[in-house]
Design a protein with these regions (language model features):
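Sec/Tat signal peptide C-region and signal peptidase I cleavage site
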Residues: 19-23
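An extracytoplasmic/periplasmic, membrane-proximal ligand-sensing/linker region
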Residues: 31-33, 220-222, 247, 265, ...
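Extracytoplasmic "Venus flytrap"
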Residues: 36-50, 74-77, 156-163
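Short beta-strand->loop
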Residues: 119-127, 178-184, 214-263, 312, ...
Length: 339
């Protein structure tokens, strides 16, 4: 792994402004171009659905109206894409992506697969502030969180870097649940198919917005039980489902829970590589937030049952830096729990 300089995103943006073509106006630069939107998961999952919806509308809000092309680059729970964006992708504003909300924090947690510093990405925004859940299939005999203390539930996972794996392992370490992770599925869509086939009995780290958007019929037909919410606060739809944060028994547990679940604030994050010229970074940020208020986008999102509670790129940048200030001892304990 090459050495990663701890440079602020502001400095990286200033460095990028000296590059070729910085004298162009954003309209001149983006006119007639295509912008690639990379998705760190397979087709059909929650990250993919959100990204493709945004790709259909965001180009209208970028000066010059470029065409945005969604492309999937799944692998290693989206760490493959995060590494590529950081080290390989063009830094001129023509490439950005969406990765697991937890991926930017993996270097802090000691993941050997990461080749980036989450603080240095050009953060564009998030489509929502997310709540995730653990669910169990109706035939497993697991109907509530307390059942997990005495009965093993096999849950599907994407990789050691994904919420699907990390949240289940954290619950085991903190509360003594008996969640067994069967990992290696390319994305959430494949995990859901595995649940239907009986390969696994449920999943953790499943975004509630994705549950409602893609599998609301499972809820309506009582085919799954929602066991626990893994976030910093409850979702309004789930007042009677326990929140992991409320189960903490010590200040140390609360600190670890905050470290791992703070990512939920940036539920569907979008970022460009470090070093994007500052005027283009501003354009992408503004275009993203304008898209989040676009009546056509919101109408399409409502039809698709996508929850839209946007978070600005500036707020994400602030959050990521705050999480990276976690004491090393706390981060090390959290890392041991989720590996």
């Amino acid at each position: 792994m090459r050495a990663i300089a701890h440079v602020s995103i502001a400095a990286m943006l200033l460095m990028g402004s000296s590059g070729r073509g910085s004298a162009q106006t954003p309209t001149d630069f983006f006119k007639g171009r295509t912008v690639d939107l990379y998705i760190g998961y397979s087709v059909g999952g929650g990250y993919d659905v959100y990204a493709r919806m945004i790709a259909r509308h965001m180009g209208r809000h970028i000066p010059g109206n470029p065409t945005i092309i969604p492309k999937n680059m799944e692998g290693a729970g989206s760490i493959r894409l995060a590494n590529w964006l950081y080290n390989v992708a063009p830094r001129d504003g023509t490439a950005f992506g969406t990765v697991s909300r937890g991926a930017p924090f993996d270097p802090l947690l000691g993941s050997p697969a990461t080749q980036f510093d989450g603080r240095e990405f050009t953060w564009i925004g998030s489509a929502n502030n997310e709540v995730s859940v653990c669910v169990a299939w109706h035939t497993t005999g697991v109907a509530r969180f307390e059942d997990l203390l005495s009965k093993e539930l096999v849950v599907g996972g994407s990789s050691a870097a994904s919420d699907t794996d990390q949240f289940a392992k954290l619950l085991n370490a903190l509360f003594g649940t008996k969640l067994k992770v069967a990992t290696g599925y390319p994305g959430g869509n494949e995990i859901n198919l595995a649940i239907e086939r009986g390969e696994v009995g449920g999943r953790c780290g499943w975004s509630w917005s994705s549950v409602v958007a893609t599998h609301k019929h499972w809820l309506e037909q009582n085919r799954i039980a929602v066991l626990i919410q893994t976030a910093l606060s409850k979702h309004a739809d789930l007042p009677d489902v326990p929140l992991a944060t409320d189960l903490a028994r010590s200040e140390e547990q609360r600190q670890i829970i905050w470290l791992i679940f703070a990512r939920q604030v940036m539920g569907r994050p979008f970022m460009a590589p470090p070093g994007v010229p500052p005027e283009r970074a501003i354009v992408l940020r503004d275009a993203f937030m304008s898209t989040m208020k676009d009546p056509q986008f919101l109408a399409d999102a409502e039809k698709a049952k996508l929850e839209i509670t946007p978070v600005s790129g500036a707020d994400i940048e602030k959050l990521v830096k705050e999480v990276y200030r976690t004491p090393k001892e706390t981060a090390a304990k959290a890392a041991a729990m989720i590996r």
